[in-house]
From Swiss-Prot:
CDD domains: S4. One of the primary rRNA binding proteins, it binds directly to 16S rRNA where it nucleates assembly of the body of the 30S subunit. Belongs to the universal ribosomal protein uS4 family. PANTHER family: 30S 40S RIBOSOMAL PROTEIN (PTHR11831), 40S RIBOSOMAL PROTEIN S9 (PTHR11831:SF5). This is Small ribosomal subunit protein uS4. GO terms for biological process: ribosomal small subunit biogenesis; translation. Pfam families: Ribosomal_S4, S4. GO terms for molecular function: rRNA binding; structural constituent of ribosome. Keywords: Ribonucleoprotein, Ribosomal protein, RNA-binding, rRNA-binding. The keyword Disulfide bond does not apply. Part of the 30S ribosomal subunit. Contacts protein S5. The interaction surface between S4 and S5 is involved in control of translational fidelity. It comes from Thermofilum pendens (strain DSM 2475 / Hrk 5).
Length: 172
């Protein structure tokens, strides 16, 4: 059954870790999205792999069963922010890339919203506790932000940066 103290790992590394093309692609993504190590990239790839596997299993089902089970998957991915509309098809699910998953990370969204000057600065703000989602402090840069939570990302109320953004504090 497994040891209850130790959680199952959420990632699977590449089957061929020393291929030049894979290494170059991974390093480019790690740099572009400010990831700390390749494990964070592999976690995103594993999530995408699971989603695509579910979509492929649905495609193998008969039409009436597929239609019934397709809607919950598509709506869940829409709420996660991975799909552009709730009317998306399984082909849209299968066309998702690892970049789509990495764009939903809190670190990336903080940078894209302009709360941080660089992607690495966004990571530092999050780990130091300056960023809140729904007025709740989140210290994990890898937190996947849902479509509903995206509008509620701001500086944490107790953070000196929040006071600076409001114009309250002069010397911080």
């Amino acid at each position: 059954m497994g040891d209850p103290k130790k959680p199952r790992k959420k990632w699977q590394g590449p089957s061929h870790p020393w291929r030049k093309e894979t290494l170059l692609e991974e390093m480019q993504l790690v740099g572009e999205y400010g990831l700390r190590n390749k494990r964070e990239l592999w976690i995103a790839k594993s999530l995408l792999r699971e989603i695509r596997a579910k979509a492929r299993k649905l495609l193998a089902l008969p039409a009436e069963e597929r239609i019934k089970l397709e809607k919950p998957l598509v709506s869940r991915l829409y709420k996660m922010g991975l799909l552009p509309s709730e009317d998306a098809s399984l082909d849209d699910v299968l066309s998702l890339t690892v970049r789509d998953v990495l764009e939903r990370r809190l670190q990336t969204i903080v940078y894209r919203k302009g709360l941080a000057t660089t992607i690495r600065h966004a990571r530092q703000l999050i780990t130091h506790g300056h960023i809140a989602v729904n007025s709740r402090r989140v210290r994990s840069p890898g937190y996947l932000v849902s479509r509903d939570e995206e509008n509620f990302i701001s500086y944490y109320e107790g953070s000196p940066l929040a006071k600076m953004a409001q114009g309250g504090a002069q010397n911080v």
